[in-house]
């Protein structure tokens, strides 16, 4: 039985990709549990407000509110939340915006399991380091 330490909300406007992403996250064995999924940025924001996850993984292009707008809104209200962007676009303007918003990782679709594992591993290590620092 896996021990979950970190909560995740995943946002992706393509249901099949969203389902695959959730499976990949939970199969890493790194302690991340998906506590909410959304097909739009506005749905994702509502879930974040309700559940305050440790990590938000979002597609960059979604209806109603795109991933960058979502991250900016979440960052303003929940500054401790970490972010991973998934995108089918390697456009440098998107990457610049992600850097400006202090996104932890930018993964190109289709998201490969080893790339997701590496990204989650780095984020988990950041969480652990912060926890150790906080606990002294």
Where in the sequence are the language-model features?
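Short, Lys/Arg-enriched, disordered terminal segments
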Residues: 1-8, 27-28, 50
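Conserved acidic segment of CheY-like receiver
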Residues: 5-17, 21-22
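Conserved sequence signature across two-component system core domains
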Residues: 11-12, 38, 56
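Short hydrophobic helical patches associated with two-component signaling proteins
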Residues: 20-25, 116
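A generic structural motif
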Residues: 29-34
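Conserved Asp/Asn-Gly motif in the active-site loop of CheY-like receiver
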Residues: 35-42
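CheY-like receiver
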Residues: 45-135
């Amino acid at each position: 039985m896996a021990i979950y330490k970190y909560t995740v909300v995943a946002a992706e406007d393509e249901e099949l990709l969203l389902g695959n992403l959730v499976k990949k996250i939970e199969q890493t064995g790194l302690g991340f549990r998906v506590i909410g999924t959304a097909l739009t940025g506005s749905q994702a924001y509502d879930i974040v407000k309700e559940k305050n996850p440790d990590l938000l993984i979002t597609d960059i292009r979604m209806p109603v509110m795109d991933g960058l707008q979502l991250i900016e809104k979440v960052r303003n209200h929940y500054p401790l939340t970490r972010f991973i962007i998934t995108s089918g676009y390697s456009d440098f303007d998107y990457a610049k915006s992600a850097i400006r918003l202090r996104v932890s990782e930018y993964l190109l679709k289709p998201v490969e399991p080893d790339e997701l594992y590496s990204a989650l591993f780095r984020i988990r290590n950041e969480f652990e380091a912060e926890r150790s620092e906080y606990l002294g």
